[in-house]
A protein has these predicted regions:
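Flexible coil/loop and intrinsically disordered segments
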Residues: 1-169
């Protein structure tokens, strides 16, 4: 959760045209928030509400599009993406709840994210910030998200522009 908060803070600061955080470091979570968010003179109730709304959007995008460890059996876990969908049921009245469904069609995106996850420091995952920001803005289908992530990997992480891109988003 601290990483999710730090990625949310990066997105929020970017949207507000404020300076980015120096690095993603869970151990410096409180200091980072003090420096980049809580220490601002312009902080007010609306500002806080906007941050919470950004956090909600980031969390939804994270839950929907980003790999997690999934228990396959008692002694085996693997990376996977489970789609979220609303299901209703009538038992003496309507009940609505969210379910997660493991889809084979998401396997390619899960593999690509797994490569990105393991090829970078697992404490930073800088690819997540631009990916989450893009998902919030575009609200893509899974196919579009997969194509954009492939583009991110091929264009940014396979070239010299990675430092520039990560620095400014």
């Amino acid at each position: 959760f601290p990483q999710l908060l730090l990625h949310t803070l990066r997105i929020f600061l970017f949207e507000k045209n404020r300076d980015d955080i120096e690095r993603i470091n869970e151990k410096e979570l409180l200091e980072t928030f003090d420096k980049h968010l809580l220490g601002l003179e312009s902080i007010n109730e609306d500002f806080v509400i906007q941050f919470i709304e950004t956090l909600f959007d980031v969390r939804y995008g994270f839950d929907r599009y980003v790999i997690k460890w999934i228990t396959v059996s008692e002694d085996k876990e693997e990376h996977g993406i489970k789609d979220i969908y609303k299901q209703n049921q009538k038992k003496g009245g309507w009940t609505y709840y969210l379910r997660r469904l493991n889809k084979d069609s998401l396997h390619g995106m899960a593999l690509l994210q797994s490569i990105l996850y393991h090829s970078q420091q697992n404490t930073t995952q800088y690819w997540l910030t631009p990916f989450l920001y893009w998902m919030i803005e575009e609200k893509p289908s899974f196919n579009d998200a997969f194509e954009w992530l492939r583009h991110l990997d091929n264009t940014v992480f396979s070239s010299k522009t990675v430092i520039h891109f990560i620095t400014y988003l």
